[in-house]
Amino acid sequence: SGIDGTVSTAVGAALAHQADGGGEAFALLGDLTLLHDQNGLLLGPQEPRPDLAVVVVNNDGGGIFSGLEQAGHPDFERVFGTPHGVSVEQVAAVADLPYTHLEWAADLPKALLGEGLRLVEVRTDRAASARLRRALQDAVAEAVADTVR
């Protein structure tokens, strides 16, 4: 995986899926992935529109890198964390797309409803997510170790 062309790939995959008789499509992206390829949201006036909900997990940077060895480096935040402060709502407005800010997990099914290309934003705390990720990894490692004993 990576961030180059992910939005454009999701749009193309959704269009292919729907051309093949499939229904709506969904893409789950991080905020940096969206920002890196936000031009993929800008479709020409003659281009078909996918029925695609793009869900953006926004932790204001590269939260996935918090679990790597370099997370303790003094320049981690500047080089890997890369906080941006960009509004996903404004990205949606520039592309003239519907936007939903999701506050509660229970509201996700409703937030995914709609037609056409649309953005759903879920804001998370990067540090809390890193702690949760570590706890889940530890629990999985312990369960696997218990299984092989």
Give residue ranges: language-model regions.
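Thiamine diphosphate
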Residues: S1-R149
